[in-house]
Amino acid sequence: AAPSGKASESIKVDGKVGEASKTTFEKPLEIKTLERTVLFEGDGKPINGDSLVSYALRAFNAETGVELGTVGYGDGLLLPSQIKPESPLGQVLGCATVGSRLVATFPSNAEAPGEVYIMDVLDTVPTAAWGEKQSPVDGMPTVTLDDKGMPSVKMPGGDAPTSIEISVLKKGDGQKVEAGDTTLLQYYGADWATGESFDSSWSRGAPYSN
């Protein structure tokens, strides 16, 4: 995680975690490097390199104080993001706990001025299906899951189906997906003839959103 520093520690923030904050800071704010300060430490699950994190944020121009945007609160929920330690998001949220509020200061570059982010860690999301296991269907591929939920597939042999066939391996109890919804999903595609995977969100390192 990025270190705390003079710039991030100078930001004043009022409001509850999970609600858009009131933020004040000296303008223009001098930011020399990426910094983060934990304003409030939540008592939830800690974030690690495998976590899918639901979060909300407010962003400001560090030179003028103008608000750049507020997302993730109320109706403007963001899709969860996978935390990679080497990414800017990972450097800000890494090792934080659910329920925490952090402030991050980003230095300017050739394309943009410095920025100030107030970020709330709302929750972590499972990285694989967690629903109730269903009985296998005869004639369908056999799917085995490892301890992280990543599948391996054994084909049943014989000719491939001539039309789409679907069997449910785990049945969830969450909200029903409706037309127009945006979803976040893991997938694993395998060749019927060889059983070898030709594409997978696990091999890509992040879920697919659509």
What are these regions (language model features)?
Residues 1-210:
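Cross-family detector of peptidyl-prolyl cis-trans isomerase
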